[in-house]
A protein has these predicted regions:
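N-terminal entry segment of metal-dependent catalytic domains or homologous docking segments
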Residues: 1-68, 161, 192-202
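PP2C/PPM family metal-dependent serine/threonine protein phosphatase catalytic domain
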Residues: 6-21, 114-136, 140, 165-206
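Conserved beta-strand-loop-short alpha-helix elements that form
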Residues: 35-46, 157-159, 205-226
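Catalytic core of PPM/PP2C metal-dependent serine/threonine phosphatase domains
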Residues: 78-164, 198-205
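Single conserved hydrophobic/aromatic residue that forms the stacking wall/gate
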Residues: 228-237
Length: 237
């Protein structure tokens, strides 16, 4: 296994700067022993998702923690850290969701929704948030997470954004299946009631030259997927 360098960085997009909106993306990385984990989450731009910037941070935290726990438990039980099927990754995704929902409910309990937060929210969502039964919607976000170990790597993805793999021979590909439900400004989300059914996965036992993950704020800045992946390769080589 080659030695990998992992990094994560998020910046406020130009449109958010113009609209005086906070950065709604979050990213993070974790490294221990020979394991590299990176995650990125993209909050939703609609005014109805009033705490989406917090939701994306919670998603990154939940993903890094859940994946690290999975790898550590696998090693303690002398099991492969890169599963042979998606069954184990579905359990990881359930763990991520549970951790994310716990953070959301704790946040609402500590800091209930304020009138000024709800000023631009539609009447439909105001009623939902007032009922206390739809708190998670306020924190909606996408999520991509990738874990590299000495046995290969795996990825978990819900919503839009891209995962680009650069192979040793210079070939570029998107190894995680695309979700056709994600189109233009519509995306699946970790806050969906059926979110566990919307996760997609990749499991590989080989070692690419590099892996790049990013929110749709990056790939939407390019006129074509080819330009995006080419730029990603240039940046990573």
């Amino acid at each position: 296994m080659a030695e990998y360098y992992q990094f994560a960085h998020s910046v406020q997009g130009y449109n958010h700067i113009k609209a005086n909106k906070v950065c709604q993306d979050a990213s993070g990385e974790c490294h221990f022993e020979d394991v590299c984990i990176i995650a990125v989450a993209d909050g939703h731009g609609s005014d109805n998702y009033i705490r989406t910037d917090r939701g994306s941070k919670f998603a990154v935290s939940a993903a890094l923690t859940a994946i690290k726990a999975f790898v550590q438990e696998a090693r303690e039980n002398h099991l492969s850290t890169v599963p042979d099927s998606e069954t184990e990754l579905i359990q990881v995704s359930k763990n991520i969701l549970a951790r994310w929902y716990t953070q959301v409910e704790n946040d609402v309990a500590c800091e209930p929704f304020q009138p000024e937060e709800l000023a631009k929210v539609s009447e439909k969502y105001k009623q939902r948030y007032a009922s206390g039964q739809y708190n998670a919607k306020a924190y909606g976000t996408t999520l991509i997470a990738v874990c590299m170990t000495n046995e290969g790597w795996f990825g978990i993805h819900i919503g839009d954004g891209k995962c680009v793999e650069l192979l040793e021979n210079g070939t570029l590909c998107e190894p995680i299946p695309w979700d056709e439900a994600c189109e233009q400004n519509i995306t699946t989300s970790i806050c969906d009631s059926d979110a566990i059914e919307e996760f997609r996965y990749v499991i590989q036992k080989d070692f690419p030259a590099a892996i790049f993950i990013g929110s749709d704020g990056i790939d939407d800045s390019y006129s074509s997927c080819l330009l995006y992946t080419s730029d990603a390769a240039d940046d990573l080589i």
